[in-house]
Amino acid sequence: MSLATEGLIITQTKIRKRGMISYKTRKRLTPLLYVAPATFLFCLLMLFPMITVLRYSLMDGAIMKKDAAFVGLRNYVTIFADPVFWQSVGQTLYFTVMSVIFHLLIGLAFALLLNTQRVHPAIRSILRVLYILPWLFTAVIIAIIWRLILDPNGVVNSILMTLHIVSFKVEWFSSTKTALHALTFANIWAGYPLYMVSLLAGLQGIPKDLYEAAGIDGANEFQKFRYITIPQLMPIIISIALLDFIWTMQVFPLVWMTTGGGPIHATEVLSTYTYKLAFSSYEFSQASASAIFILILSMSATYFYIKHQKAR
């Protein structure tokens, strides 16, 4: 073989190898190109704002001062020393826990009613539309509806006074004794359809053979519900409850449009507390510290949600 031929073969081999390397590189990079837009948006809309808020929480007079000084954890110490902050934490937990519990109970009850064969299909169709109505309204509309219903001259007080249950007009959203309970009730009404739809889908996915076998073994309706229905629905219940906990803990529009955190901080939750620090008191550094606290709570709940999803 001549030297020219050997050189040609070597050159072709190098070109082929270069092409193979290029192909392998493209194969590795192609998936990254698909996720690049989502990664860019995540960094732009999520990661960058979180880092910015964390930086503000460690500074004095962030945004308001041109040369804001680094103060470490002083803003956290300040809000932790504020009684209103801890009041808002307690009220947030009450608002969230009560909402999640009653969302589950009401959603499960309505799902069972819509799934039963004892109710005529036409009636079930009507009930399905009625029960899902709260989902059709925005938070602003829901706030307006309940402000009208629970107005001192509204329909609730009229009914209660007609039935002689109360002898005076109750200030549902203006009294420190009733405001938080009324607000929680409004949020419960707005949020149960998510559970109803999810649990109804779960009920319809349970094999009928399980109930038939349990009936043959002599199980009554309560035993079927306890030992078949609930265990089959438990993965859905846990997933929805954790998501609902995260969402409810961050509720802002409904609270702001009904009570604004009042009266006298009676319905102050973490979201309204943070908003007032930022846009009423212009304490952006302290508001950032409060926002980081909310983020930590949300991330803790998210951790349990992801752990549960992996276990499934």
Model-found features: residue ranges?
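Short, Lys/Arg-rich, polar N-terminal cytosolic tail immediately upstream
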Residues: M1-T25
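A structural signal for multi-pass alpha-helical bundles of membrane permease subunits
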Residues: K27-R312
